[in-house]
Amino acid sequence: MTDRLAGLAAPGHTAIVTQECQGAVIGPNAGLAQLAEEARREALPNITRMLPVARAAGVRVVHCTVQRRPDGLGANHNAKIFAIGRGEVNILPGTPGATVLPELGPEPTDLVLSRWHGVGPMGGTDLDAVLRNLGVSTIVVVGVSLNIAIPNIVMDAVNAAYRVIVPRDAVAGIPTEYGNAIIDNTLSLLATITSTDELLHTWSQHKGTS
């Protein structure tokens, strides 16, 4: 895995995409407390470890967040997921709920893309165009959730001809067993499944050389 991962995740063509790592989703006062607790147990600490090493190696970091107007104008109302937590948290642009968690940045070299609709950033933002402009062909997907958004971005990215890496200890879903089943039975057929430590080892070899 190490040699193959080194080529697949080479900094020159790789970006980390963080998915909904924002206050309203996995912060201390998140709308879905169970998901936030699960994400903060393992995934968030590992993402926090991963990003500085990735940046130092020259890997791009793109944060994908979700935002809504208080009246929901222009946002989806056509699935149950969009009603969960409605009114309990504020994801108005510029609020803590709609902002990347401070422990993750954003740093000056990071990009932040926010969406108004949908369940994933490929269809709801300029993510595809931005990644292509950056020369990215491999995406490392981290964040939440394994229930919906992570499978969505993995499938969309594969359909758009990207190679995808999923560090299994830097993504989260509920219940934990379901998240693991999604990784083992679905995402493993679409993406390279690895760990935070394996990526850190790979990128540490590039530190200061990009």
Where are the language model's segments positioned?
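Short, flexible, mixed-charge acidic loops at enzyme active sites
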Residues: 29-31, 74-80
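Short acidic, Gly/Ser-rich segments with clustered Asp/Glu that frequently serve as metal-coordination loops
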Residues: 22-28
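A short, N-terminal amphipathic alpha-helix
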Residues: 42-60
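Short beta-strand segments at enzyme active-site cores
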Residues: 18, 59-66, 71, 167
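Active-site-adjacent betaalpha module
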Residues: 1-15, 52-57, 81-210
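N-terminal nucleotide-binding beta1-loop-alpha1 segment
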Residues: 15-21
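Active-site loop signature of alpha/beta-hydrolase-fold enzymes
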Residues: 24, 69, 173
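Short glycine-enriched, charge-decorated loop/helix-capping segments at active-site entrances
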Residues: 31-40
